Amino acid sequence: MDSLSIVILAAGKGKRMYSSLPKVLHPIGGEPMLARVIRTARALNPSRLVVVYGHGGEQVRARIQDADIVWAEQAEQLGTGHALKMALPHLPQDGKTLVLYGDVPLTKASTLQRLEQAAAGGMAVLTDVLADASGYGRMVRGADGKLQAIVEHKDCTPEQLAIREINTGMMALPNARLADWLSALNNGNAQGEYYLTDVLELAVKDGVAVESASVDASWEAAGVNNKVQLAELERILQANQARALLEAGVTLADPARIDIRGELKHGMDVSIDIGCVFEGAVELGDQVEIGAHCVLKNVKIASGTRIAPFSHLEDAVVGAECRIGPYARLRPGAELAGHVHIGNFVEVKKSKIGEGSKVNHLSYVGDAEIGRKVNVGAGSVTCNYDGVNKFKTIIGDNVFVGSGTLMVAPVKLERDSTIGAGSVISKDTPAGELTVARARQVTVPGWKRPQKKSG
C-alpha cells in the first residue's frame, strides 16, 4: 500500500472571527479546531503529518506541541495551492497526500478513508450536494459523468452556478505529480489566488484518473469563518455525541441540554439530568446518577454514586455509592472512598476521605486525611494555610467533629475522639476522649447595647 501523508492547511487569519486568537485555535467540543482535525487525521495512520501555518503562527505552534508534526510556514496567504506548495519540501516523492483544513473540524475518519481509497488509481476529491450551493466551488462533469474541473463560485458561468455538487476542498493527490501541478498553477482568477482546485483540471489533461467520494452529512465539510458558524457546528457536535450516548444506553433527560468537551466513558444504567457539562476525561461507573447543572472535569466516579444538582467536580476520584451535593465542590486532589456523603456547600480539596464518612453541611476540607466513619459537623473548617505554607489535618477513624469546629493544621484527631461544637483545635486530641476548646459562656447582667445619638 502507498504511504499516506496528510497536510492540514491552517494559515488563515479568520478576519470575521473578530478575535486576536488564530481561527484554527477557537475551541469546538472543548479543544481547538486544529487539534480535532489532527486527531481525526491520526486515525488514518499517516506516515507524515504536515501543518501549514501562517497568521498567529507562534500561538498555533505553542498550543499544538505534538512532537511528530512537521510545520511549514505560509508567510503570505496566496491561496490554497500556494499553501500546499509550502508543504511540498516535506513530502515524499511517492505515495498519496491527503489535504485537510484546520477550520473544518467535524469530518469523520471513515469519510477520509473513503477519499483515500477513491484515489487509488490517481486523485480524488471529496464532494457534497447542497440545495443551495452559493459560495462554493462547483464540480463540473462531462457528458460521461467524469470530473473535468472545479470552478470557484466567483468564476462560474450562469450554467455552472446551477450545479449543486460542490467541492469541499478536501482531496487526495499523487505525490509523484504534485510538484509539476503546483508549479503550473496561476492566479488569473477573481481572487488573484493560486487555487488548489485547479489541480483537478491539470490531472485531467495529464490523463490521470479523477474520482470523487461523498460526505455522509453536510456538516462533515462545513467550515468556520465566523462565530455563528462555530456555534452551529458546536451544536451539531453536541447533538451527535448525545445521540451516541443514548444509543449506548445512557439516559439523558434532554439530549439538547448536555455538553461534552472531552471524552465521557460510562457503564450501564447511567442517567444524566439537564444542563450538565463534562470536560476532559470523565468516567462514570454503572448506575451513576448526575443531577441537573453539574460540571465534571477529569473525574472518575464509581458505581451507584449520585451527584445532586449544581455540584462541581474537578480532578477528583469518587468511590462507590457516594452521595454528593447539592451545591458541593470537589477540587483537584479530592479522593473519596465508598459510601461517603458530601453535602450542600461543602468544599473538598487535596484530601482523602475514608469509607462511610460524612461532611454534610457548609464545611471546608483541605489538605486533610480523614478515616472511616467520621462525622464532620456543619460549618467546620480545616485551617490549612498560614499565608505562606499549607499544613495537613489528620482525622482518625470514627471521630465525631462537632459543628463549627476549626481545626488549625498541622493537627491530628486520634480515632474515636469527640470534638465539642465550636471548638478551635490547635493541638492533637487523644483517642476515645471528648475535647472541648472554647471560652466559657459568660452572661453580663445589665449590659446595654450602644445607642446611636439622636439628631
Swiss-Prot record:
Coiled coil: none annotated. It holds the Pfam family Hexapep_2. Residues 1-227 are annotated as: Pyrophosphorylase. It is found in: Cytoplasm. Acetyl-CoA binds at A378, N384, Y385, S403, A421, R438. One of its GO terms (biological process) is peptidoglycan biosynthetic process. Residues 249-455 are annotated as: N-acetyltransferase. Its cofactor is Mg(2+). Keywords: Acyltransferase, Cell shape, Cell wall biogenesis/degradation, Cytoplasm, Magnesium, Metal-binding, Multifunctional enzyme, Nucleotidyltransferase, Peptidoglycan synthesis, Repeat, Transferase. It comes from the Bacteria. In the N-terminal section; belongs to the N-acetylglucosamine-1-phosphate uridyltransferase family. Catalyzes the last two sequential reactions in the de novo biosynthetic pathway for UDP-N-acetylglucosamine (UDP-GlcNAc). The C-terminal domain catalyzes the transfer of acetyl group from acetyl coenzyme A to glucosamine-1-phosphate (GlcN-1-P) to produce N-acetylglucosamine-1-phosphate (GlcNAc-1-P), which is converted into UDP-GlcNAc by the transfer of uridine 5-monophosphate (from uridine 5-triphosphate), a reaction catalyzed by the N-terminal domain. Homotrimer. This is Bifunctional protein GlmU.
